[in-house]
């Protein structure tokens, strides 16, 4: 994913992890989410085995709307309707080609800006 983002000409901040050893993914999910919440990064992408734990960790940070996506339609809809600012994926769930398609869809889809969706986002953030 990192190489794919760089090929797209995007600047990447890698918050880890840097090995294939078992790690405490909440540390990395929180670091990525904090970078987005602080405005250091526009969007964030986090990955763990299922994507579940790291998405939960990211969503603990105020202002983060991290969506776990295993298909491109979910990635599109979470941007259109939820204005998600982070994407979580499971490395053990989606293959490389699908993951890259999900990433592209997530990054290339803009928030619809519809009042009903913004109203719901406001309710979530209360």
For the regions a language model picked out, list residue spans one by one.
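Charged helix-capping and loop-helix junction motifs
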Residues: 26-30, 69-71
């Amino acid at each position: 994913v990192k190489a794919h983002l760089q090929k797209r000409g995007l600047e990447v901040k890698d918050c880890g992890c840097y090995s294939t050893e078992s790690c405490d993914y909440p540390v990395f999910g929180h670091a990525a989410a904090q970078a987005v919440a602080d405005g250091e990064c526009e969007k964030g992408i986090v990955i763990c085995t299922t994507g579940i734990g790291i998405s939960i960790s990211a969503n603990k940070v105020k202002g983060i709307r991290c969506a776990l996506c295993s298909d491109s339609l979910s990635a599109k809809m979470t941007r259109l309707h939820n204005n998600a600012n982070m994407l979580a994926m499971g490395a053990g769930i989606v293959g490389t080609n699908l993951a890259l398609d999900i990433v592209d869809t997530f990054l290339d889809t803009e928030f619809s800006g519809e009042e009903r969706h913004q109203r719901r986002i406001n309710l979530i953030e209360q």
